[in-house]
From Swiss-Prot:
Record GO terms (molecular function): toxin activity
Keywords: Amphibian defense peptide, G-protein coupled receptor impairing toxin, Secreted, Toxin, Vasoactive, Vasodilator
Gene Ontology terms describing biological process: defense response; vasodilation
GO annotations of cellular component type: extracellular region
Tissue expression notes: Expressed by the skin glands.
Keyword match Transmembrane helix: no
Keyword Secreted carried by entry: yes
UniProt-recorded name of the protein: Des-Arg9-[Thr6]-bradykinin
Coiled-coil segments: none
Lineage of producing organism: Eukaryota, Metazoa, Chordata, Craniata, Vertebrata
Family, as annotated: Belongs to the bradykinin-related peptide family.
Organism: Pithecopus hypochondrialis (Orange-legged leaf frog)
Function description: Produces in vitro relaxation of rat arterial smooth muscle and constriction of intestinal smooth muscle. May target bradykinin receptors (BDKRB).
């Protein structure tokens, strides 16, 4: 996270 980064 935030959405746009994976797997964060």
């Amino acid at each position: 996270r935030p959405p746009g980064f994976t797997p964060f």
